[in-house]
Amino acid sequence: MWGGNKSIGRVSTAIYIALEAGHPNACFLGDVYHTYKGGSDFDALKMLGPQALQVFHWNDYPSNPPREKIGDGDRVYPGDGVAPISDIVKGFLQVGATPVLSLELFNKKYWAMPPLEAARIGIEKMKASVALAL
């Protein structure tokens, strides 16, 4: 899914493509930011199960800029924005999904940090954001 793309910017279109692929291992690569950017409701993820939800890009987004203007570089560490992170995790668990969470950030402020520090903070923020939902 790619939130800014008209062809594959919503959960529904990405799932449609995976279904139409007809491959037994086809799945959905979700992303917190792209779900928001594309205008999908996070509750749509509850319609998917473990087969479709194997990996999910984990990040957050601020309240400003608005959806129409937000860009990849505006992503922030999980828990530092306004995304419904706890609800997303609870939704995964409701459908029996335990996807691998992959931190994906394109924030130049983080890129300017020493790599190990950025990674350490990222792992801590990921763990904390999931723990709040459990």
Predicted regions and their residues:
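Active-site-proximal beta-alpha loop/turn segments in soluble metabolic enzymes
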Residues: 1-5
